[in-house]
Amino acid sequence: SLRRRKVALVGDDRASETQRLLSPLHYLRRALAPGADLIEGGLDDVLLASPDVIIMADRIGLPDSPALAEWLDKGGLLVRFAGPRMAASERLRDEPFLPVVLREGGRDIGGALSWGEPRGLAPFPPEGPFAGLTIPTDATVRAQLLAEPSPDLAQKTLAQLSDGTPLVTRAPMGQGQIVLFHTSANAEWTNLA
């Protein structure tokens, strides 16, 4: 439909001006502002506004929120982006509201689960939401959160890197959906931002 979507940004934006310009929320704000009505605040506050979409950037320690579960159950779309805080978490496996179980630690150039150079993107599946999009030849990912292997991982994967590891995953929750970008929303882990 032509109506503007109400999109909520939930993140920690209590930073200096310089830090704000580098924050994932800054990138999301600039990308979304032309086509969406943006709401910002804490999770409980934005849920009261009944947004169409809630976006969280590198948030960890999400409470097991009945209000968020109910919002998803009624058709909400929760989009999460990974980042250094999530990668550093020792309780990543227990994090609620993710489409897949994540391995602790993430993977980056020079890290413990390392690859030698940044990875490009694999072609998008023809039946997925990114079908028909052209992948820039210089698009690379330097770090990501890895999904634990599971029998349904392939069907939850919307986009993957050239090595076959998931870049974007999705799972239904009630009438809603949870989507995870396994890399950051800013340029810290990828040049896709």
Question: What are the residue ranges of the model-derived segments?
Answer:
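N-linked glycosylation sequons
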Residues: S1-A193
